[in-house]
């Protein structure tokens, strides 16, 4: 074995296997897996690169924006794309890595959460997106911006102070800001309620993202004073299937009706074709989001694609 290279690599692999064995419980044998080891090494590499990016004034981090449209404007249109009314955007994190290219939030947020970097990056996201919203509100005062919050931001930073600072630095109208949280994973619900009450006192709306993937009931969500339920795209994908979609559509319709009765709106995510709209229109959702109306894009591309909606009618 070559001391300078192969031995060190062998020890790394042995340490990895030992760590994986401990994770699986006491007295368990873990057989080395090269694929899992490669993922582990890549993760460590990305963690260090992300840490460097944060130190270098968030170099490589970008925000992309996906249109959110008014579903009520589409039900009577023969051409669903031409009849679309973009009313806002969801801000989505991206990070440009020389070795791996442009990475999405699902690839980097878990690493940011585990490493503790989510607190500074989260503050950067709030300021960046609030400022972008302020710029677009110069042309359309009603245009809103949705920003995702990680549950770790509630635990590793003073999230209320972070939001207040972003509001002050950007000068955005808080009524045009929507903070998105998921159903589960947060600190105790009493503390969460207090924090959300402070957001509402600032006139900031709160949406529940990926609704249906957790175990919350609508009454609990109502107690959080949520503005909109965003149904997970998996619901929509099942609902538009030729076979088996009818039962899923009934579930979606039930959720929409209940949400409306409780004073909440519903956004359907993952709408990808005009046929999807035709199938979903009778369910009476309030908003749609999906590739039919636009993929996540840079702010410049978003302006080019949606200029007529950024400018007030």
Where do the protein language model's features map onto the residues?
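Structural preference for long, well-ordered alpha-helical segments in enzyme cores
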Residues: 10-17, 49, 91, 107, ...
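Active-site core of bacterial EAL-family cyclic-dinucleotide phosphodiesterase domains
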Residues: 42-111, 148, 180, 208, ...
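Alpha-helical scaffolding flanking metal-ion-dependent phosphate/phosphodiester catalytic sites
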Residues: 13-14, 147, 221
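Alpha-helix termination/capping residues and helix-transition junctions
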Residues: 23, 58, 139, 169-174, ...
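Catalytic core of bacterial c-di-GMP phosphodiesterases, primarily the EAL and HD-GYP domains
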Residues: 1-2, 29, 39, 85-90, ...
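C-di-GMP signaling machinery
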Residues: 3-8, 16-65, 75-78, 112-116, ...
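EAL-family c-di-GMP phosphodiesterase catalytic domain
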Residues: 2, 38, 98-100, 150-157, ...
